[in-house]
UniProtKB/Swiss-Prot annotation:
PANTHER family: ATP-DEPENDENT CLP PROTEASE, HEAT SHOCK PROTEIN 104. It comes from Nitrosomonas europaea (strain ATCC 19718 / CIP 103999 / KCTC 2705 / NBRC 14298). This is Chaperone protein ClpB. Belongs to the ClpA/ClpB family. Part of a stress-induced multi-chaperone system, it is involved in the recovery of the cell from heat-induced damage, in cooperation with DnaK, DnaJ and GrpE. Acts before DnaK, in the processing of protein aggregates. Protein binding stimulates the ATPase activity; ATP hydrolysis unfolds the denatured protein aggregates, which probably helps expose new hydrophobic binding sites on the surface of ClpB-bound aggregates, contributing to the solubilization and refolding of denatured protein aggregates by DnaK. Keywords: ATP-binding, Chaperone, Coiled coil, Cytoplasm, Nucleotide-binding, Repeat, Stress response. The lineage of its organism: Bacteria, Pseudomonadati, Pseudomonadota, Betaproteobacteria, Nitrosomonadales.
Amino acid sequence: MRFDKFTTKFQQALADAQSMALGQDHPYIEPQHLLLALMQQDDGSITSLLQRAGVNAQPLRQALTQSLKLLPKVEGTGGEINVSRDLANLLNLTDKEAQKRGDQYIASEMFLLAALEDKGETGRLLKQYGATRAALEQAVDSVRGGEKVTDAEAEGSREALKKYTLDLTERARSGKLDPVIGRDDEIRRTIQVLQRRTKNNPVLIGEPGVGKTAIVEGLAQRIVNGEVPETLKNKRVLSLDMAALLAGAKYRGEFEERLKAVLKELAQDEGRTIVFIDELHTMVGAGKAEGAMDAGNMLKPALARGELHCVGATTLDEYRKYVEKDAALERRFQKVLVDEPGVEATIAILRGLQEKYELHHGVEITDPAIVAAAELSHRYITDRFLPDKAIDLIDEAAARIRMEQDSKPEVMDKLDRRLIQLKIEREAVRKEKDDASKKRLALLEEEISKLEREYADLDEILKAEKSRAKGSQEIKEELDKLRREEEAARRKGDLQRASELLYGRIPQLEAQLAEQLHHAESAEEAVQPKLFRTQVGAEEIAEVVSRATGIPVSKMMQGEREKLLFMEDKLHERVIGQDEAVRLVSDAIRRSRSGLADPNRPYGSFLFLGPTGVGKTELCKALAGFLFDSEEHLIRVDMSEFMEKHSVARLIGAPPGYVGYEEGGYLTEQVRRKPYSVILLDEVEKAHPDVFNVLLQVLDDGRMTDGQGRTVDFKNTVIVMTSNLGSQMIQQMSGDDYQVIKLAVMGEVKTYFRPEFINRIDEVVVFHALGEAHIKSIARIQLSNLGKRLAQMEMKLVVSEPALTKLAEVGFDPVFGARPLKRAIQAQIENPLAKELLEGHFSAGDTILVEYSNGHMQFTAQR
């Protein structure tokens, strides 16, 4: 018996049988060992072959295991285990069977045919569980497809379609695919291309997330429902799994062997199968080693001859990058462009998917949530595409509510923690014997019993709410199951069963569900508070958007409305004087938050003009602090760094071919990460004039294209440019009316900036020079900051009025604005106070009183 003539699979089974015999202390390898080893192989080909021949595989496996337990055992042999006489005879019979069929190698299924002729236990068991010679031979012929076994790996390449593809039509039949709404034109165009005589291979090209794969799933559903032309009826749509094809292909030629087996089976199928290759570009170069062919080249002949009916899908970028380079492959495909659906189409798609997501999460998705998901994702998530980004919002919001349902409500959690705290205290007080402790114990007992009653009431409400939600969820699941059953019955032509379900059971369950929801609503109205949410509304969608982008999308709370109405007062806490500037900025923010501003432009764009140190930069910081409660969302760009022409590339990123192309631009990358921010372009007149050309698009359309060709959204930013232009004029005309000063300054601005740049700015704001009264107020703000630093050391700072007046006097300089005041505070207060602290004159808990007398500042401690 030549074991080298066995196929690899058969050799593996023999080795497994030997191992099995050794493990069970059997002296010989019996036919039962080998048959069980064949049935336990990973790919399960022998098991599926037996099932195809009408054999009950599972009971047969159990019977074989049982028969092995009855075999005699010999302990302590330790030597080589040989083949028994029965098995040797069977293997010879197997060789004969293979020769009859003209095979060059002996395959596993030949052993099954030989085993049927066996007079021993194996043959008896096979016959007992339904094996017949005719059925087994028929099963072998259908698996082989008329092929002879010509190499040792022949078994591995069988049923390649089953191993390396996923049947989409079967998934559609069992209701596992999501419904495909709309996309009729694209599906019709795909069907049209599939019906061509040559080049009948459509490739769906579109941005990621627009629904290319969904179109193929829609085609599979139409084929199952019979809503396709006669030529496509009863065809299968198989999705090729490239990962499975490549996985485990260790040796040269193994991948090609697998792909060849797939193509061979498709050719034998005679056009009854449509192959879907998702991410088509992965075929170009897949499996390519030195001197070997890649998958793309292997597909070309099959595509050209029309043996392979193929639908591809890939993105625009990858199609251009990989497929277009291979002109011979590209010409075999017909392009079908898939555009991003609009907001209305997305709403229709979401309504179609609504039931599936409700069923999965066990929550109710309201119609306002669907509309909000489409509109908010379109407006605020600009770097992705509809409908994918809208579906993500619905999914995440529903998942969040589901998570809330599965965890303990916040109000109960707080009660629980409070009860634990009180019980710990009660145990501690119990050990004390004095009267005060006894009184405290009585109070604690009363408090604990009160909280326990409250907790028990809430627990009852929670249980009732959960049971209502569970009841409606069970009805929904049953409804979904019956609808799938009704569709299957209609397809089979079992109209009696379909009508029973459609006009009997389904309406009955729908009425039951409506009644349950009605009861739930009336129960919710009667019981307050409601402990957990069961609905996804527009507010929940807005929360998800806000969390993902940092943009406040949710409805304004009363507190925020008041905050916006009194915005000027809040900004004036940090910016002294400059009433006109503060008012203009506040108006722009109120316009945008109330929803009246143009959604395609930034919230506001301003040019702040004025002398140094009058509060231009400070107003930007105050604005960032007001909008985001921190200055982290202030993107500050010092335009003096962009004095050369080539420095524009630093703002938007280097173009292709230049060093730093992958890094992105300084401004564009920050805005992509923080789309809701205040952008401060400081000292704008110091930048090269070409920088302003880049800003034109931002100011007009609220977008900028970076060095990598990505569009960055500036629609949720406030853009502020500061400049010292006309500052001398402002100093000279400080006593004049604001409008007069503005007109004079604008004359100088127009000589420096181009008209198209000035024309795109919302407001040019002129900051006037500061007076002595303003400086005194600024001194108070700066001293309060010093007070905060001292408060960390547990000290208080009190500055007398004369000392404050002196500081304002020393720090006042009409040319330099408020900046000299900082230096004055450092020189007059911080420096001497630092010495006093180091000498130990003040300690924690002291109040430091600062007074001015005899020409200098004096510090005294008040304890």
